[in-house]
Swiss-Prot record:
Its main location: nucleus. Substrate binds at K265, K495. This is Tyrosyl-DNA phosphodiesterase 1. One of its GO terms (cellular component) is plasma membrane.
Length: 608
């Protein structure tokens, strides 16, 4: 497959067919990632997506920018290129080859480039010392940056002054003021949050050695349950990672529908003092907590219900029962223990609604329990109708895109948008086409000028095979920009959805979730609209003004602004209104090369 665009020419062989066209948020691989040096067996090993593999490969052996075409072999070019998409497909590959079977496990060397502060103009080339061994630099980087916030007063962050308890992760390489109210995983697991008794970590990707080191030394031997979706070789690799740790047990989430993933990211933290729930967007690997924009919701510290009392411990948002229902969907004995723990705690102070997805085919009232129908039900029951609602846009922001069909009517602007448009019991759904839809997904230029450079695109696994089938979608795309939080150059792995006012000064609701823009994550109707089919596990929290005694939230002008703004202003982590792609912008596609311009480390992107 020969292609050409603003960022260079390339060829993709049929063996590079990506599983991204399958409807799932991240593409699992059975690859194990190892650091190739003495003692490699002791380095982190974890399964990840094909896109993440490519990013790791280019961190090991970056391809330095060159003004010549000598890097790539001569290519055939088809006449009548898709100029509007920026890609040109050779005629011999117009029909995609059948999907290749999942590759067998292979070992890939990892190297992390030494962190360098953000570029002044976004185009400056980076230079670095390549003399040190790759894994030595990785260790230096982790030691230097994986410490909790210096001088950060955790108590100030957890006090009642922040009604939303919505945070971003710390980003290495931004000004300190943009990390002053952000959290690292070490902060979350800190003794300041509670005296840990045991914990459960729900996630997609695990680096077990790294994870254990994020716990304080005094908590590292406390029981840890890892809830994952790995199968076959990937499962074997995860078990091998966990084997040295007697306190770690594993729970495999059942994934009975093809191409589903366990994408949920949640921590259950049981303390001597109570229980805390953390719902977030980061994989449990170093890169996800380093230079990306990620979201975190922290629950209050839930006290234990005194024995002999008949208090339910339920919140006005029904969070306790909904969390238990979500955990019961796993049908796993090891989670029954955590369900019992939750039953014994008072969750009544919770002010968010839980929105989950679990694999299955749901009919009747069960259809409203999960996915976009769950969002629709909550918006119907608890959101306030707005005058001129048809002029209130819908915003979706995500880090991957599934296959959404031949045109917008197949899913995006039919069932999905209809759920997003719901506002109150009496509100009529406005004409679906009349409500503006803003989709935020990083452009190639966003990735090129990011702190990580092109390897940031390893966590944005939108493939050419999927993208070329839905050119119509990209007219909705808007750039990533986050001056409000100092994260314009920290590529987003966070996923958010919201309903802002026409002038973007207010929002009717805000959702932070693990769910990307895919049918696998949100569900798709079957059987003439009577059945909702979901492939994956996802989890997020919905902020509704009614739970805070409000009709709408005002948007906070600066994400990290202090007490000068009213308490009830909501901290949206990126800039509003979103900026539409320019005529030369293209969505980031992970599995094609970009060789015409260097990234912030002076490198090109040649993924294979």
């Amino acid at each position: 497959m020969s292609q050409e665009g603003d960022y260079g020419r390339w060829t993709i062989s049929s063996s590079d067919e990506s599983e991204e066209e399958k409807p799932k948020p991240d593409k699992p691989s059975t690859s194990s990632l190892l650091c190739a040096r003495q003692g490699a067996a002791n380095e982190p090993r974890y399964t990840c997506s094909e896109a993440q593999k490519a990013a790791h490969k280019r961190k090991i052996s970056p391809v330095k920018f060159s003004n010549t075409d000598s890097v790539l072999p001569p290519k055939r070019q088809k006449s009548g290129s898709q100029e509007d998409l920026g890609w040109c497909l050779s005629s011999s590959d117009d029909e995609l080859q059948p999907e290749m079977p999942q590759k067998q496990a292979e070992k890939v060397v990892i190297k992390k480039e030494k962190d360098i502060s953000a570029p002044n103009d976004g185009t400056a080339q980076r230079t670095e010392n390549h003399g040190a061994p790759a894994c030595h630099r990785l260790k230096e980087e982790e030691d230097e940056y994986e410490t909790s916030g210096e001088g950060q007063d955790i108590w100030d962050m957890l006090d009642k002054g922040n009604p939303f308890q919505f945070y971003l992760t710390r980003v290495s390489g931004v000004k300190p003021k943009y990390n002053s109210g952000a959290l690292h995983i070490k902060d979350i697991l800190s003794p300041l949050f509670g005296t840990l008794v045991s914990s459960a970590q729900f996630n997609y990707c695990f680096d077990v050695d790294w994870l254990v080191k994020q716990y304080p030394p005094e908590f590292r031997k406390k029981p840890i349950l890892l809830v994952h979706g790995d199968k076959r070789e990937a499962k074997a690799h995860l078990h091998a990672q966990a084997k040295p740790y007697e306190n770690i047990s594993l729970c495999q989430a059942k994934l009975d529908i093809a191409f589903g993933t366990h994408h949920t990211k949640m921590m259950l933290l049981l303390y001597e003092e109570g229980l805390r729930v953390v719902i977030h967007t980061s994989n449990l690997i170093h890169a996800d907590w380093h230079q990306k924009t990620q979201g975190i919701w922290l629950s209050p510290l839930y006290p234990r219900i005194a024995d002999g009392t008949h208090k339910s411990g339920e919140s006005p948002t029904h969070f306790k029962a909904d969390l238990i229902s979500y955990l019961m969907a796993y049908n796993a004995p090891s989670l029954k223990e955590w369900i019992d723990v939750i039953h014994k705690h008072d969750l009544s102070e919770t002010n968010v609604y839980l929105i989950g997805s679990t694999p299955g085919r749901f009919q009747g009232s069960q259809k409203d329990n999960w996915g976009h129908f769950r969002l629709k039900k909550l918006l119907k029951d608890h959101a306030s109708s707005m005058p001129n609602a048809e002029s209130w846009p819908v915003v979706g922001q995500f880090s991957s895109v599934g296959s959404l069909g031949a045109d917008e009517s197949k899913w995006l602007c039919s069932e999905f948008k209809e759920s997003m448009l719901t506002l109150g019991k009496e509100s009529k759904t406005p004409g679906k086409s009349s409500v503006p839809l803003y989709l935020i997904y990083p452009s190639v230029e966003n990735v090129r000028t990011s702190l990580e450079g092109y390897p940031a695109g390893g966590s944005l696994p939108y493939s050419i095979q999927t993208a070329e089938k839905q050119n119509w979608l990209h007219s909705y795309f808007h750039k990533w920009s986050a001056e409000t939080s100092g994260r314009s150059n920290a590529m987003p792995h966070i996923k958010t959805y919201m309903r802002p006012s026409p002038d973007f000064s207010k929002i009717a609701w805000f959702l932070v979730t693990s769910a990307n823009l895919s049918k696998a994550a949100w569900g798709a109707l079957e059987k003439n609209g009577t059945q909702l089919m979901i492939r994956s596990y996802e989890l997020g929290v919905l902020f509704l003004p009614s739970a805070f005694g409000l009709d709408s939230f005002k948007v906070k002008q600066k994400f990290f602004a202090g007490s000068q703004e009213p308490m009830a202003t909501f901290p949206v982590p990126y800039d509003l209104p979103p900026e539409l792609y320019g005529s030369k912008d293209r969505p980031w596609i992970w599995n094609i090369p970009y060789v015409k311009a260097p990234d912030t480390h002076g490198n090109m992107w040649v993924p294979s």
